Amino acid sequence: MAAPRLKGLHHIKLPVTDLETSLNWYGRVFDAEHLTRFDHYDGAGVRYAVILQLPGVDIPIELRWAPDAAAATVGYDPVHFVAGGADDLQAWVAHLDTLGIEHSPVITALAGQLLIFRDPDQTYLHLLTVPEGGVLAIEMNPDAAEPEGPWIMPDLMRHP
């Protein structure tokens, strides 16, 4: 019997150590809109999660105040955004430079070009180029991989 068909992805949840710092950072970097009606509060009235909508991204991002989880996943790279083409990556380089955010150079890797930077909790975020036809149209290029670079393969993500 086949599995029931999924209808999509609801949201992405990222653990953070400081909700306000991360909310402000994602707002500055991505022009993220804070969807306040979805704020999560505990029984004591403490806000512990916020939902953001990033321009150009259909899936909302949840930032959840979870310091232990954020500390345990330093160096993890759970989210890979589509930036567009090579010119779009250069626009992101300029944007991140203007904000003073450290980032990788534009890297040519297995699945195209990418730019990598970290959020305030040291979660690695990737911006990738994608060809016409989308992700499934990517032709892998194993000769172009740069697996030993500190940006492309943080220690946490190295295989045994």
Regions found by a protein language model. Give the residues of each.
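Short, acidic Gly/Pro/Ser/Thr-rich loop/turn segments
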Residues: 59, 70, 134
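Short beta-strand/turn micro-motifs at beta-sheet edges
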Residues: 1-2, 64-69
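Short, solvent-exposed loop/turn elements at beta->coil junctions and helix N-caps
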Residues: 37-42, 66-68, 107-113
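Vicinal oxygen chelate
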Residues: 2-5, 9-17, 51-55, 68-160, ...
